[in-house]
């Protein structure tokens, strides 16, 4: 019995195959040496068959693996060949695209060549045409120049002939007349526009005035008349002062002193220079002399004060008065448009404009100084001398606020009273104390002697602009006894719209202050109980209370020219007058049971 065989491969490295070859060799040796029996041979043959089959399987796997390796190499070769073919195809496509572009460029170049040829031909034709046109223009220019020269010669001859023609002179005269007429027409048109604006303004004013009551219109007319009457003398005095200042300035200019500035504005420098020339002790002596002469001239001044409505202040050479001249003139011209503002407007105006009523002693003092010497300038504080620029700003501010309307009654009730001469006395800081004591004694004696005689009210509520220093001086020198209470007004009001109707007297039995222009609508005199009412003896006493005792009317129709006094007698004194607009209908005075006391109403609506 033979065993299976197995082919030996060269360079065998598989351990199973090597063991199989070794086992076959040993099995063959055993059989050859008869060292194994039959059963052992059969079992060994089965084992060798199985082992040989496994080795053959290994051989088959190795062959399959070798074939797969060969196929992989072939695949790699195919891949490389495919990649090479792709690259070759792309290169071929790129070459084809480049060849196509080259062909297009050739076509474009050929087309450009043809276009350049056409342009060259067109340029040649254009140059030929341009040369032809240039020759034509040159010929035309020559012809035009020749024709122009001929026309110039002909025009010169025509103008020469026209200059000698009369029609040309007539035409020029007509053109001049036409120009003058156009200017006249333009002026008339402007005048027409101005008149139309004036008409519209007056219509609006008349429409507004037509809504007012007759009584209010009469009151305003009288107020405006009195304001005009009081401002005109001041305007005249200001003009005279201005002329005096101009004359003095001309004299100083001739003498080589200070003069007006280049802008012809009234500067304070020439006035201040004149003040500096005099010694301050000499000023004090002159003021003492002028004030001590009041006793001798008091009767004459009293008669002068009684014969006029108000006494104007002396034209002191204060630069502020020079600046106030256009303000006063403007107020006088525009007085017809003054409207009585409300209380809030008056409170806004009060810090800017101060109404300074004049007392009896200040009136006498001013008259004495006017009779003694009117050319002595009032001394100025050193702050004004050192700050002319601030004073010029004050002048401009005063001019800006001058055209504001104000109600004399409201301002008279709200603003504290102060005399401008007393302010001047406060400014005389360098006057010796002995002179001050002498002046105070003389003024006290003079006021006690002349108080029963001088009954004139303040001089038309002089409107003067004062700075902060003067306002402070006024508050320091104000007399506490003259502050108005609820049932008493100032005793020297020349222009008082006393709507309260209460005038403060010296005692309960005396009458109220005698106002030259007192709209005393209720006519209640001094005293809170209203029992002793002197009433008003003003020029326009609308309710006919002319100063008699116990509030009785005198029946004097001259003091009530408008006939407003329908109720001459206030029962029990001090009651509501007829011109009271008392819509609640009580109509009872202060002493009756229904009124409940003295009437202190304004217009009792």
UniProtKB/Swiss-Prot annotation:
Subcellular location: Chromosome
Main location: nucleus
Record field: compositional bias (Acidic residues): 384-394, 409-430
Superkingdom classification of source: Eukaryota
TM region(s), chain numbering: none
Segments forming a coiled coil: 115-201
Compositional bias of kind Gly residues: 524-537, 588-597
Compositionally biased tracts (Basic and acidic residues): 395-404
GO biological process, one term: homologous chromosome pairing at meiosis
Phosphoserine modifications at: 269
Effect of residue 269 to D: Phosphomimetic mutant. Less dynamic state of syp-3 at the synaptonemal complex during pachytene, decreased DNA double-strand break formation, increased germ cell apoptosis and reduced brood size
Effect of deleting the gene: High levels of embryonic lethality and a high percentage of males among the surviving progeny. Failure to localize syp-1 and syp-3, components of the synaptonemal complex central region, to chromosomes. Failure to form chromosome synapses and lack of synaptonemal complex formation leading to a delay in meiotic progression. Impaired stabilization of homologous pairing interactions. Lack of chiasmata formation during diakinesis. Reduced crossover frequency. Increased rad-51 foci during pachytene indicating impaired DNA double-strand break (DSB) repair progression. Elevated germ cell apoptosis.
Entry GO CC: central element; chromosome; condensed nuclear chromosome; synaptonemal complex
Comp. bias (Low complexity): 487-505
Region (Disordered): 288-319, 357-430, 479-605
Job description of the protein: Constitutes an element of the transverse filaments of the synaptonemal complex (SC), formed between homologous chromosomes during meiotic prophase I, and is required for the assembly of the central region of the SC. Required for chromosome synapsis and chiasma formation between homologous chromosomes during meiosis, mechanisms that are crucial for crossover formation and meiotic recombination.
Protein name, per record: Synaptonemal complex protein 4
Organism (species): Caenorhabditis elegans
